[in-house]
Design a protein with these regions (language model features):
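PLP-dependent class I/II
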Residues: 1-106
C-alpha cells in the first residue's frame, strides 16, 4: 500500500500537483493551480486525452462542487505494473504542457 501511495504522490508532485495523502484508502485527491486548467472537469478531460489516464473531478466529492474544482481524484488500487505505466504517462503531462508553452512563446 505505502509503496504504491508514495509512487503516485511523487509522480503527482513531479507534474506540479499537490497530493493529499490518504491514511488508508486507495484514492488520492490532488490539487492543481487554476492557471493550469480552468477547472476539474477540464483537467480530467485534458489528462485523459493527452496520456490516457482517467481521473475523477474533485467536484464529485464535495457538497459544494466548487470546493473541489481545483482537485482531481486518482486511484492507486492497481497492479504495480499498471500503476507504473500510469505514472510514466502522467509524467508526460508536464513535458507535453511545457513543450506547448515553449512553442507558443517562440
Amino acid at each position: 500500500y505505502l509503496v504504491k501511495r508514495e509512487m503516485l504522490a511523487d509522480t503527482l508532485r513531479q507534474i506540479g500537483l499537490t497530493p493529499f495523502l490518504p491514511d488508508g484508502s486507495y484514492y488520492m485527491l490532488a490539487a492543481f493551480e487554476k492557471d493550469r486548467w480552468p477547472g476539474a472537469v477540464a483537467a480530467t478531460e485534458s489528462i485523459l486525452q493527452q496520456v490516457g489516464v482517467a481521473t475523477v473531478p474533485g467536484t464529485a466529492f464535495y457538497r459544494r462542487p466548487e470546493d473541489g474544482d481545483d482537485q482531481l481524484r486518482f486511484c492507486f488500487a492497481k497492479k504495480m505494473s499498471d500503476l507504473e505505466e500510469a505514472c510514466a504517462r502522467l509524467r508526460r503531462v508536464s513535458r507535453e504542457r511545457a513543450a506547448r508553452t515553449l512553442s507558443t512563446v517562440a
